[in-house]
């Protein structure tokens, strides 16, 4: 493990590709170093888990409804057969409050995402010029990353 990870190559690859798949050693440490380097370069960062993400575009960017868990017999007259739907603010809403900064969304446990969900993450990056996304796709013996589009081609097309 190098003592100094400048993050220059990572920053350049992130700027050119906008969406990266990263493979980090399981003992950790690299992620926080890279996040700290990106914050120093002017990025506003947000880290979250990819588990339970559902539709990434709606869950991350738009106001959406979530039904609370069913707790047994309830009155059907008030809410109908569908139940009560509570509105939830987008998970990454604090990222989008500032329009002047570059934004970095870091998704942990990205290996649970399907091909279509990964493709929608790439589409989100292309629609928003200031948004970049890093998806952790699993462990590796050394820190590696590649464009998410290349990862999809390698992983799902073979």
Curated annotation (Swiss-Prot):
Recorded catalytic activity of this chain's protein: a plastoquinone + NADH + (n+1) H(+)(in) = a plastoquinol + NAD(+) + n H(+)(out); a plastoquinone + NADPH + (n+1) H(+)(in) = a plastoquinol + NADP(+) + n H(+)(out)
What's the protein's topology in the membrane?
A: Peripheral membrane protein
Q: Which GO terms describe its molecular function?
A: oxidoreductase activity, acting on NAD(P)H, quinone or similar compound as acceptor; quinone binding
Give a yes or no for keyword Translocase in this entry: yes
Cell location? Cellular thylakoid membrane
Q: Where is the signal peptide?
A: none
Question: Where is it predominantly found?
Answer: membrane
Q: Name one Pfam family in it.
A: NdhN
| Alphabetical keyword list | Membrane, NAD, NADP, Plastoquinone, Quinone, Thylakoid, Translocase, Transport
What the entry lists under InterPro entries is as follows: NAD(P)H-quinone_OxRdtase_su_N
Residue ranges spanning the membrane: these are none
Q: Name one GO cellular component term.
A: plasma membrane-derived thylakoid membrane
- EC number, as in UniProt: 7.1.1.-
**UniProt similarity note:** Belongs to the complex I NdhN subunit family.
Subunit architecture: NDH-1 can be composed of about 15 different subunits; different subcomplexes with different compositions have been identified which probably have different functions.
Task of the protein: NDH-1 shuttles electrons from an unknown electron donor, via FMN and iron-sulfur (Fe-S) centers, to quinones in the respiratory and/or the photosynthetic chain. The immediate electron acceptor for the enzyme in this species is believed to be plastoquinone. Couples the redox reaction to proton translocation, and thus conserves the redox energy in a proton gradient. Cyanobacterial NDH-1 also plays a role in inorganic carbon-concentration.
Protein name, per record:
NAD(P)H-quinone oxidoreductase subunit N
From the broadest rank down, the organism's phylogenetic lineage runs: Bacteria, Bacillati, Cyanobacteriota, Cyanophyceae, Synechococcales
Gene assigned in the entry = ndhN
């Amino acid at each position: 493990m190098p003592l100094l990870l400048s993050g220059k190559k990572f920053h350049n690859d992130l700027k050119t590709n906008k969406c990266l798949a990263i493979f980090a050693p399981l003992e950790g440490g690299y992620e926080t170093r890279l996040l700290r380097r990106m914050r120093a370069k002017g990025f506003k960062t947000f880290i979250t888990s990819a588990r339970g993400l559902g539709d990434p575009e709606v869950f991350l960017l738009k106001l959406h409804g979530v039904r609370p868990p069913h707790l047994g017999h309830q009155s059907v007259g008030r809410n109908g057969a569908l139940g009560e739907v509570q509105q939830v603010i987008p998970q990454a809403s604090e990222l989008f409050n500032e329009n002047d900064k570059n934004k970095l969304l870091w998704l942990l446990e990205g290996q649970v995402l399907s091909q279509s969900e990964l493709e929608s993450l790439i589409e989100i990056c292309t629609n928003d010029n200031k948004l970049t996304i890093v998806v952790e796709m699993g462990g590796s013996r050394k820190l590696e990353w590649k464009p998410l589009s290349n990862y999809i081609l390698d992983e799902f097309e073979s």
